[in-house]
A protein has these predicted regions:
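C-terminal motif of bacterial Sec signal peptides marking the signal peptidase cleavage site
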Residues: 26-29
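Long beta-sheet-rich domains in secretory-pathway and surface-associated proteins
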Residues: 31-143
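Mature N-terminal, pre-catalytic/accessory segment of carbohydrate-active enzymes
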Residues: 141-183
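Substrate-binding cleft and catalytic face of glycoside hydrolase catalytic domains
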Residues: 189-389
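Glycoside hydrolase catalytic-domain groove-lining segments
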Residues: 379-437
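Aromatic/acidic polysaccharide-binding cleft in carbohydrate-active enzymes
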Residues: 420-531
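Carbohydrate-binding surface patches
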Residues: 526-576, 613-619
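C-terminal beta-strand-rich structural cap/linker in extracellular carbohydrate-active enzymes
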Residues: 599-622
Length: 622
């Protein structure tokens, strides 16, 4: 009666396990026993195979993915073999036939070396000289296991103390933004919830025009058209960056500050008058009292000293001299203000930090420092491909680690936080004649990745990586602009996809003086090369898990769609939850209304699938 059983499994060169079924198992009685001499068998029909599902998910932790296989039209006088083909490396399949019929279960096991992604595979059935196949989609899923312990090596002592914000650059070209969009602004800006909104007045928004002693030397109208509405929203506490000196203190050709004792003192007095204007009831000039319209209800606590000196014709020692002159003059007017130092364009930090943190007697900073600020753009060239932009994120993490290391060499600076006060996809802009400012011989082309689905992956990836590195603020550059840079279209007032990305990052990972940042939970992820995972726990016991699909479809993609990824989020270590929501932002998201928040059923393992660049935010409530 041995012919009534299953023949042993045989292993093909590919590593696929193939079950060879004896025909006698598939028909009444034991005739045939898999041999053509055992009898004529059942006349064959067209050989076919059907599957119980068109998609099989095989997690990288070795949990089998299964599909039921049914064979029809087989010649029962010949053996039937079932195998899987076109499997990616690191995946093994095994077919287990069921007794009493031409069917069974195919198991697919992905090892840790199996690359995550979506593949086209097939089940192949061979019966004598006949062959039939049925294709299916094989998904190799990343597994992210969220632990119940705080990872104290990340963030600020294990906490994600990073707030979201945005920026304005008042000038004669954009100062009417709020006037032009009264139906939506500043309500939309307030909805975004930014903290310490950055204000960087340039050109005619610099309020001091001359130094003649006449009242006409000062004009705040262009600057205040932006500043005054900003003072009414969010935390009512913007950061005013004194980005440049008044034009009469600068070189007419380069626009760079001209160093000299008299110019330094004039710049310091200008800065002190700005503090007087917004915080102390104003100042008198040419017989006229200049005072902020919103004083005393709204004042400005945070001030930044100069913008990107390291690419604007200033040496590190000159910047320190400037800083050490301006800050005391401003503090002498209002001792409660806080100061952001450096505001660097990302370059080689070893050229700037060592001298800044040197002992004051050796030329280091000797004035108050509350924050050290830097900027991060991964490119200044629209032709750079998607993978290049993603690859530069770990570099800014190294940069931040270095800055903290240097600040730690001085006792009075070791607890100073880092803020990234400018961040977007591309720093380039039109130099005025249609050419690139960064690459003058190249035509300027708007980079849509600042508002496309690419941004839905890129900004959350940056947020997670920088927050884990201890960065404490991430500023979007800039609020009202074009499709390269804006959260809101400066012409129409409509929201871009970037608005909703930043909004939900702020909502899901709040960090305010009254609501300290969440704990960063320990995490084990089977693959990090194409997905970013962040798990946090709030003081109320709720847990937020962010899943970012940053998989590039092709190495040449520039604003591509990305590649699908499935992530199995394992929260079994966290116990049970009473409810859960899911929010996804990707290329299908409506940029006007934003993503929908969906109620989902809590489970120990939650599957998240993104069809390309994007982010899913899970919130689990106790």
């Amino acid at each position: 009666m041995g012919g009534c059983g299953m023949k042993p499994l045989r292993i093909l060169d590919s590593g696929t396990l193939v079950a060879v079924l004896a025909a006698a198992v598939l028909v009444t009685g034991c005739g045939g026993a898999g041999s053509s001499s055992s009898g004529p068998g059942t006349p064959p029909g067209p050989l076919s195979v059907s599957l119980s599902t068109s998609t099989v998910v095989a997690p990288q932790d070795g949990t089998p993915g299964t599909v039921d296989v049914t064979v029809s039209g087989a010649n029962t006088g010949s053996s039937v073999s079932v195998a899987a083909s076109n499997l990616p490396s690191g995946v093994i399949s095994q077919f287990a036939p069921a007794a009493g019929g031409l069917h069974g279960t195919l198991s697919l096991v992905a090892g840790s070396t199996a690359p995550a992604g979506t593949y086209s595979a097939s089940v192949v059935v061979t019966n004598g000289t006949q062959t039939a196949s049925q294709s299916f989609v094989l998904v190799i899923a990343i597994v992210a296991s969220i632990g119940n312990s705080v990872d104290t090596t990340l963030g600020v002592g294990g906490k994600l103390e990073q707030f979201m914000s945005t920026s304005f650059q008042p000038s004669e070209g954009n100062y009417q933004f709020f006037q032009n969009h009264t139906a939506t602004e500043p309500a939309l800006l307030n909805k975004l919830g930014p903290q310490h909104i950055r204000l960087q007045g340039l050109s005619q928004a610099v309020p001091m025009k001359a130094n003649t002693g006449s009242a006409t030397d000062w004009d705040f109208s262009i600057l205040d058209a932006i500043v005054q509405p900003v003072l009414t929203v969010g935390d009512n506490s913007p950061e005013f960056q004194i980005a440049v000196a008044p034009a009469f203190l600068n070189d007419p050709a380069s626009g760079h500050f001209v160093f000299g004792t008299a110019n330094l003192q004039a710049f310091a007095e200008y800065s002190a008058n700005l503090v007087r204007y917004y915080n102390k009831g104003g100042f008198t000039w040419g017989g006229n009292n200049f005072v902020s319209p919103s004083y005393p209800q709204h004042q400005i606590t945070w001030w930044g000293i100069y913008n990107e000196y390291n690419i604007n014709g200033m040496t590190p020692s000159e910047y320190i001299q400037l800083y050490n002159t301006l800050v005391p003059a401003m503090l002498n007017v209002d001792s409660t203000i806080k100061i952001s130092a450096m505001e660097l364009s990302v370059a080689d930090p070893t050229a700037d930090l060592p001298l800044f943190v040197a002992p004051p007697a050796s030329g280091g900073v000797n004035a108050q420092v509350n924050v050290v600020a830097t900027h991060f753009y991964p490119t200044c060239n629209q032709r750079d491909v998607d993978s290049t932009l993603f690859d530069r994120v770990p570099q800014i993490v190294q940069y931040i680690n270095y800055v903290y290391q240097e600040l730690g060499t001085r006792a009075d600076l070791k607890n100073v936080p880092i803020w990234v006060t400018e961040n977007n996809v591309n720093a380039d802009y039109d130099n005025g004649n249609g050419m690139s400012n960064c690459i003058p011989m190249q035509k300027f082309v708007l980079d849509p990745r600042g508002t496309s689905a690419f941004f839905g992956a890129w900004r959350p990836y940056v947020f997670s990586q920088l927050g884990k590195a201890g960065n404490q603020a991430l500023y979007h550059w800039v609020y009202g602009a074009d499709m390269q840079s804006g959260e809101v279209d400066s012409s129409t007032g409509s929201t871009y996809l970037s608005f909703w990305v930043d909004y939900w990052l702020g909502q899901m990972f709040p960090s305010t003086p009254g609501f300290p940042g969440p704990d960063i939970l320990q995490l084990a992820v089977t693959e990090t090369s194409s997905a970013e995972i962040l798990g946090t726990k709030n003081s109320d016991g709720s847990v937020v898990v962010m899943v970012v699909d940053r998989a590039v479809h092709a190495s040449t993609d520039n604003n591509g769609t990305g590649d699908p990824r499935t992530v199995i989020v394992d929260v079994s270590a966290l116990g049970t939850f009473s409810g859960a929501t899911s929010i996804t932002i990707d290329r299908k998201t409506n940029a006007t209304s934003g993503p929908a928040s969906l109620n989902i059923t809590p489970a120990h393992k939650i599957s998240v699938t993104l069809d390309g660049y994007g982010v899913t935010l899970l919130k689990l409530n106790p």
